[in-house]
Each structure stands twice: as C-alpha cells, then as structure tokens.
Amino acid sequence: MNYAIEFHDANYPFLNVAARKKSLKHSLLSVVSGLAIIKLGKQEYAIEPGQYFWIPQGCLSSLTFLPNTHVHRCDFSVRLNDAFAQQAGFIKPSILLKALIEKLAKTETRSDIQLDLLAVVKHEVLAISPNLSNSALSQVINQWKPGCEARISRELCLVLTLREARKMKLSGKKESQIVEHLFAGNTEEYEQLCFLVFGEAL
C-alpha cells in the first residue's frame, strides 16, 4: 500500500549501495548513527549523524549506507499537491521537526497518533530551504581513489574500496582482476572482507 506520507525507521547492518535512479517521492532522510553518502551528479555528500537531507521527487541520485547505519526517512507522495522544495540538499530542521521525527520512531505505524504527527511533519517540511554544502568529510570522499592515502578512517577506506569492487564486478570485471587491482592479489582477504562488509560474497 502506498500512503501519501510514510515514516521509515531503517537499520543497515551491512554495506548497502543503491543504484542511481530518479526518486519517485519527496524524501527527508536523517542519519541517527553511522554514515550515509548520497551521489548527485558527480559529487558525493556525506550525511553524518544528526544531519537531515532533502531528496525531491525526480532527483537523480544514488545512496550508500555504511555498515551499522541507522536512519529515519519520511516519504511524501507525488499525489500531494503541496509546494515541496525542488532542490536537493541539507536542511536545518526546526526544533519541532526534530522532536516530531524522534517521536515518530517510537510511535506505532499507521496509528492515529502517527498520522497526526506526519501531517505536522508535512507542514514543517514545506518551510525548509535545502542547500548543498561540502563538508570536510565529503571533500575527502570525493578525492578518494583506491590505494591512495586519503585522510579518512581505515574503516571508511575499506568500505569505499569494497564499494569500488562491487562497481567493477557490475561492470563485468573478473574477480581475479578486482582482487589484483584492489587487494594486491590477496583473494582470501577479499573474500573475508566481502562477508564482513556486505554479509555475502560479491
């Protein structure tokens, strides 16, 4: 069932990489813990804990959720005739909007209380002004290349390397080529890391 407004409380125990596609709904994404990365055009933006990001309907993007990431998301159907922001970007949530999202996470799905809260969320969202800003982490992620000594944590470097391995696999590269290019020919390490980060073999 597709509702006009929906709230999702999602956990990603493993690396989750979504294909680039146009958004079918307007979405407000907030990261509770972990890290999400959204790619718009050729730029990637890190969405860190406590940050809120607006994705308008029709926006071409791809989302990456790092392992152990917890997010809240409100989706608004195109059936709604309200004037939602058409620009993707970070938003500074009002105190009320933050409180509403926190309350929604503890409220029974599709209950009368949740529906009332979602109606107020919609009114708050209609007043947002999204803008794109490059944080220090976003800049490092955009500059990162396999094997380079970027100023990022070992964990993030590992996740970005495995995301690159997945991309190579999808483009038709053989496993032996991926292992040689990204893991110095160490097949055992590659297989172990795939299970650790993806929860399965690539």
List the predicted regions and their residue ranges.
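A cytosolic small-molecule/anion-sensing beta-strand core signal
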Residues: V32-S33, E48-P49, P67
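Ligand-binding loop in jelly-roll beta-barrel domains
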Residues: C59-F90
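A short, Lys/Arg-enriched amphipathic alpha-helix from helix-turn-helix/homeodomain DNA-binding modules
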Residues: L137-K173, F195, G199-E200
